[in-house]
Amino acid sequence: MWNEFKKFAFKGNVVDLAVGVVIGAAFGKIVSSLVKDIITPLLGMVLGGVDFTSLHFGYGKSAVMYGNFIQTIFDFLIIAASIFMFVKVFNKLTSKKEEEKEEEIPEPTKEEVLLSEIRDLLKQQNSSKDRA
């Protein structure tokens, strides 16, 4: 049972997925900070001091903080656009590497060369028998 767990836990895909989740969480924090600390204040200056997070409505002590919701949507859109651009660049780089691999014709192995020579000799023998 322990060996099965080790095979599962240390498979390349599982480890890659775990690394992706950790990096994704850190990337999300970076983009959230970018939106909260840089983009939203700049947008506020352009639009005359608009701060989404303070927007709310309510009655008495109850309040619906729809500004936080708008801010979260804004964060999501920026994160989604950033990930889209990252994946697009990554796919472009990956496809170039695959094209380079396809262009390279591998050298035939010794066995392939030997088999080709044997095939050619057999063809010569068969063609000389047909002529005789």
Curated annotation (Swiss-Prot):
Main location: membrane
GO CC annotation: plasma membrane
Transmembrane annotation, as ranges: 14-34, 38-58, 67-87
Pfam families: MscL
Subcellular location: Cell membrane
InterPro entries per UniProt: Mechanosensitive_channel_CS, MS_channel, MSC/AndL, MscL_channel
One GO MF term attached to the UniProt entry: mechanosensitive monoatomic ion channel activity
Membrane topology: Multi-pass membrane protein
Subunit record text: Homopentamer.
Entry protein name: Large-conductance mechanosensitive channel
Species classification: Bacteria, Bacillati, Bacillota, Bacilli, Bacillales
